[in-house]
């Protein structure tokens, strides 16, 4: 397959290099990733500034393209300008840190995959449950297998897969769970400081997790050492509320 590989940790991140090496022997892989880290930018796109693309070499060899934009920008520019015909599949990751629960909406990694789904391209986002992972073997074993299955079975229009992998060696993974997006979220705290000129500013710090207790959710499957695979889509409509709103005499 022709695969577009992107991420939100940036083109020089360990995770994207790991996925590239895991996929390159079996697939034609094109890397288009942000030049700088774009964690938690969500589905933002660049509107008021130009986008610049530059070649990137790693370990003395051409690796891919760095873009001065967001993960969603990377997918858009790759499909519109850098890959012809469009890719057969878009893979976003490996993200450092899980993307589960409500935090999915903040994720640039997941947003790259949902952007591809909006464009009608099968896609998946891949994250590992650590900001400093020590072993990618579970990722490099599972993702190529999942790609083969998706290529065979297909995905419904507008749907992508959100994959979260425990920070464990492959032989310690308990299995794979198909899950729903949970309600786990971060409870943010801000550190209030004062600069030398007396102006107040804030650092986001000391975030705590409100975890799910439903075994069908992505976060709990991950916490129990299972790989979590969640089908997600960009349609945010709450369909059950449509009839109710219609009775409000708006």
Swiss-Prot record:
Q: What is this protein called?
A: 5'-nucleotidase SurE
Q: Which reaction does it catalyse?
A: a ribonucleoside 5'-phosphate + H2O = a ribonucleoside + phosphate
Q: How is the cofactor bound?
A: Binds 1 divalent metal cation per subunit.
Give the similarity note: Belongs to the SurE nucleotidase family.
Highest taxon of the lineage: Bacteria
**HAMAP family assigned to the protein according to its UniProt record, in alphabetical order:** SurE
GO terms (molecular function) for this protein are: 5'-nucleotidase activity; metal ion binding; nucleotide binding
Reported function: Nucleotidase that shows phosphatase activity on nucleoside 5'-monophosphates.
Localization, per the record, is: Cytoplasm
Primary localisation category: cytoplasm
Cite the EC number.
3.1.3.5
Keyword RNA-binding annotated: no
